[in-house]
Every structure is written in structure tokens, then in C-alpha cells.
Amino acid sequence: MPSIYLNIIMAFSIAMVGVLVYRSHMMSSLLCLEGMMLSLFILSTLMILSMHFTMAMMMPIILMVFAACEAAVGLALLVMVSNTYGLDHVQNLNLLQC
């Protein structure tokens, strides 16, 4: 396995640890989730290109579309929560209440 794959897997792992460590702030969690999605995009693109698997060439593009939608929804929730409560602490919120 080339070292580029190990570096990307390590970047994904560090971003996942970041989600677990910085889960009290919504903005930090969103940034770590974006790092995870970016490393998945790069890893899937490299795997598809190295294996010459032409049937799955659309998968990284679809992954980026879902990442963009996730970022838009996350930022909209961040704006709504910060306007309503004045903070972005996830632990102080109960989003199940109306």
C-alpha cells in the first residue's frame, strides 16, 4: 500500500478524533466532518484511478454533492441555533423540543 493511502486514512482518522474531541461546539464538529468528507473524496478518487474502475467514476462527484449539501444544512443549523440561543454549544441544546 503506497504511503499516500496511509496519509489519507490518517487524515480521516484525525478528523474523526476531532469530531469526538470537539463535539461541544457545532462549528468545530462541522469542520471536522468536512475534513472527513474531503479525505473520503480523495481516497475514493485515488482508488478508482489506480484500479482503472471506469464504472465508478461518478462516485466521487456524488460524494462531493452530498458533502456540499451536508455543509449547507450544517451551516443553516448553526446560524439558526446561534441566532436563537446566542451560542453554538451542542451540549446545552435539546433540538427535539419545539
From Swiss-Prot:
A cellular-component GO term for this protein: respiratory chain complex I
Function: Core subunit of the mitochondrial membrane respiratory chain NADH dehydrogenase (Complex I) which catalyzes electron transfer from NADH through the respiratory chain, using ubiquinone as an electron acceptor. Part of the enzyme membrane arm which is embedded in the lipid bilayer and involved in proton translocation.
InterPro entries in the record: NADH_UbQ_OxRdtase_chain4L/K, NUOK/Mnh_C1-like
Official protein name in the record: NADH-ubiquinone oxidoreductase chain 4L
Transmembrane annotation, as ranges: 1-21, 29-49, 61-81
Domain of life: Eukaryota
GO annotation (BP), single: ATP synthesis coupled electron transport
Gene3D superfamilies in the record: 1.10.287.3510
Recorded GO MF terms: NADH dehydrogenase (ubiquinone) activity
Topological type in the membrane: Multi-pass membrane protein
E.C. numbers: 7.1.1.2
Family: Belongs to the complex I subunit 4L family.
Subunit structure: Core subunit of respiratory chain NADH dehydrogenase (Complex I) which is composed of 45 different subunits.
Alphabetically ordered keywords of this record: Electron transport, Membrane, Mitochondrion, Mitochondrion inner membrane, NAD, Respiratory chain, Translocase, Transmembrane, Transmembrane helix, Transport, Ubiquinone
Organism of provenance: Dasypus novemcinctus (Nine-banded armadillo)
Taxonomy of the source species: Eukaryota, Metazoa, Chordata, Craniata, Vertebrata
Pfam entry (one): Oxidored_q2
Catalysis performed (reactions): a ubiquinone + NADH + 5 H(+)(in) = a ubiquinol + NAD(+) + 4 H(+)(out)
Compartments in which it is found: Mitochondrion inner membrane
Keyword Translocase assigned: yes
